[in-house]
Amino acid sequence: MTSVLIVEDEESLADPLAFLLRKEGFEATVVGDGPSALAEFERSGADIVLLDLMLPGMSGTDVCKQLRARSSVPVIMVTARDSEIDKVVGLELGADDYVTKPYSARELIARIRAVLRRGADNDDAGADDGVLEAGPVRMDVERHVVSVNGEPITLPLKEFDLLEYLMRNSGRVLTRGQLIDRVWGADYVGDTKTLDVHVKRLRSKIEEDPANPVHLVTVRGLGYKLEG
């Protein structure tokens, strides 16, 4: 049974959500603060964590940092603040998705399933002798070969690295900061225009209509996402 750890100090939100999750076949555990969340995760683990950003005693961002330091468990950040900066911070800390209050419990459960499914798909892709697939794109990492709809394409090293990282996180929003750190390194001192140029070049090679991309899409104010 898939286990969900709900970290939420508002019982009026947490209890009905836990009830609905159990009806849908999940195992749900509710804790109301950050230290309890970390202790429960150490004790029992979880397949996915729903993490409120505003918690008493320890913020959700601090909890996320500590979770990421010890585990790759999927995290969905739940926040009452709808600002872009909060979403960017959550994603850069390693959250897999974010939901803004008030939310539909049914929508949240759908997002939980989507995040879990993406994780399973990415694990399967990574286990297949270094072969990744997303939409029409197929990448053989070890042989450094990429094809689109079965036709080989040529990618310079940085474009290859960028596409590989996007494919390993297919369906997940990646911020510009995450992409730059991964492909150019944390000590990169340029601006984000370099990333945008590389994205434009990738689109010209993997999209049927690069001006209206459907695979490598922009998530306004956040970054980019490669659709599977």
Curated annotation (Swiss-Prot):
CDD domains referenced in this protein's UniProt entry, alphabetically: REC_OmpR_RegX3-like, trans_reg_C
Classification via Pfam families: Response_reg (PF00072), Trans_reg_C (PF00486)
Alphabetical list of PANTHER family matching this protein: REGULATOR OF RPOS, SENSORY TRANSDUCTION PROTEIN REGX3
Disruption phenotype: RegX3 cannot be deleted alone. However, the deletion of the senX3-regX3 operon is possible, possibly due to the accumulation of compensatory mutations. SenX3-regX3 deletion mutant is more sensitive to phosphate limitation, showing a reduced ability to grow at lower phosphate concentrations. The M.tuberculosis operon can functionally complement the growth phenotype in M.smegmatis under phosphate-replete conditions, but not under low phosphate conditions.
Source organism superkingdom: Bacteria
Entry annotated with the keyword ATP-binding: no
Listed GO MF terms: phosphorelay response regulator activity; transcription cis-regulatory region binding
Keyword match Chloroplast: no
Classification via SUPFAM superfamilies: C-terminal effector domain of the bipartite response regulators, CheY-like
UniProt entry keywords in alphabetical sequence: Activator, DNA-binding, Phosphoprotein, Stress response, Transcription, Transcription regulation, Two-component regulatory system
Protein name: Sensory transduction protein RegX3
Gene Ontology CC: cytosol; protein-DNA complex
Biological role stated in the UniProt entry: Member of the two-component regulatory system SenX3/RegX3 involved in stress response. The system is involved in phosphate starvation response. Once phosphorylated by SenX3, activates the expression of the alkaline phosphatase phoA, the high-affinity phosphate transporter pstSCAB, phnDCE, phnF and senX3. May act as a negative regulator of NhaA. Acts by binding to a DNA motif consisting of an inverted repeat.
PTM info: Phosphorylated by SenX3.
Disulfide bridges in this chain: none
Gene of this entry: regX3
Gene Ontology biological process: regulation of DNA-templated transcription
Domain Response regulatory: 3-116
DNA-binding region extent: 129-228
Induction remark: By phosphate-limiting growth conditions.
Organism: Mycolicibacterium smegmatis (strain ATCC 700084 / mc(2)155) (Mycobacterium smegmatis)
4-aspartylphosphate PTM sites in chain numbering: D52
